[in-house]
Amino acid sequence: MRLDQVRAALDRRLDPASRAPLAVGFSGGGDSLFLLKTVLDWARPLDRPVLALVVDHQLQPQSTAWTAEAVAKARALGAAALGLTWTDQKPRTGLPAAARRARHALLATAAREAGARVLILGHTASDLAEGVAMRAEGSSVSNPRAWAPSPVWPEGRGLFVLRPLLTLTRAEIRDALTREGETWLDDPANLDLRYARARARAAGALTPLLPVRESPPPGVFEIDPAGAIRLPRDVVPAHLAAALLCASGAERPPRGDRLARLVERLRSGARFTATLAGARIEADQAVLICRDAGEAARGGLARLDLAPGACGVWDGRWEVVAGKTALAVVALRGRTSSLPAEQRARLSAIAPAVRPSLPVLLSLDGDAPGELVLDDLQLEADGEARVRSLVPDRFKAAVGLLDQESVT
């Protein structure tokens, strides 16, 4: 077994000097059992805490008992453990995709609240191969990457997912566990042929795939404090998609024909303005990508109310923590004239296309004027509200510039 490759992946990505907990997705199944034992072996000499997170999707009658059993197993192995329950109403269609989204949201929220920066998951080479078969059936399941930002937003902000088992097959893992005398839980959903994953497994003899190679990070880009991204016109499609994703605050990047057509227009050298996936694109000598303020007419840039001390994410782009007073976060569009003269003067340094989608903080305690947020440290009038642009770190993570825990 290529166990040395698994340990090398942990060494490559994790910071041995950190004392932040390592979050591990744990179901009690074979893959996650092998993963948890391996992570514990890696973390124990470093005196680093490991937190096993067990998700109960509430899709099987026995799920509560299975969750309790998995939590007990994780604790017996030496990890802290927490059960998480998907309590939302289950959709009649698209259940696998909804369950994936809910699972990642629960895991990300719990990991962040525990102080973890990395969530470690047990996807294998077999999962890579099954994903090919599933996508051939029309599934939206993505190709697991060895290191990637959390796929849910904004719950997963600042959190990375590490998958160190992608070079091992499920059979290899189970053989190793059997030699160690271990037993594991088997989810009956894995045998339910109503689901694409089960059909892919039942097909058998899938060709294992190597993990996907990522595009090299962009050599030239600029992100200003207002959250706009500037890229060269010859930007590769993956990085263009990442810029559109981050500038718009959306959860999923654009793909397919629409992205391909935008790339072609950029390659043509023509000057143009366009919108795509909630972002505005201005192509001149370089490409300016920012939030499309017109999305306000379609429900975007919605007002965010925060109680004193509460934290929230506005429009997927700005994290705001209220101070001693309640506040609302709204878009600047249509409010410029109500700002103090000093604030209006500062707007001249910002590209006109970027201005309408900037955040404004409004005090809900009295009639204090709004505060335009122009940089990460702009404070509310009471001097306590904190505001942080999420765009820079999210873009750097999306294009592979944050490739280790120590640089996140």
UniProtKB/Swiss-Prot annotation:
UniProt: ATP binding residues: S27, G28, G29, G30, D31, S32
Catalysed reactions listed for this entry: cytidine(34) in tRNA(Ile2) + L-lysine + ATP = lysidine(34) in tRNA(Ile2) + AMP + diphosphate + H(+)
A cellular-component GO term for this protein: cytoplasm
Matching SUPFAM superfamilies: Adenine nucleotide alpha hydrolases-like
GO annotation (BP), single: tRNA modification
EC number: 6.3.4.19
Intracellular or extracellular location(s): Cytoplasm
UniProt keyword annotations, A-Z: ATP-binding, Cytoplasm, Ligase, Nucleotide-binding, tRNA processing
GO terms, molecular function: ATP binding; tRNA(Ile)-lysidine synthase activity
The keyword Cytoplasm appears for this protein: yes
PANTHER family per UniProt: TRNA(ILE)-LYSIDINE SYNTHASE-RELATED
Family assignment from sequence similarity: Belongs to the tRNA(Ile)-lysidine synthase family.
Entry domain remark: The N-terminal region contains the highly conserved SGGXDS motif, predicted to be a P-loop motif involved in ATP binding.
Function: Ligates lysine onto the cytidine present at position 34 of the AUA codon-specific tRNA(Ile) that contains the anticodon CAU, in an ATP-dependent manner. Cytidine is converted to lysidine, thus changing the amino acid specificity of the tRNA from methionine to isoleucine.
Entry-linked HAMAP family: tRNA_Ile_lys_synt
Protein name per Swiss-Prot or TrEMBL: tRNA(Ile)-lysidine synthase
Organism per entry: Caulobacter vibrioides (strain ATCC 19089 / CIP 103742 / CB 15) (Caulobacter crescentus)
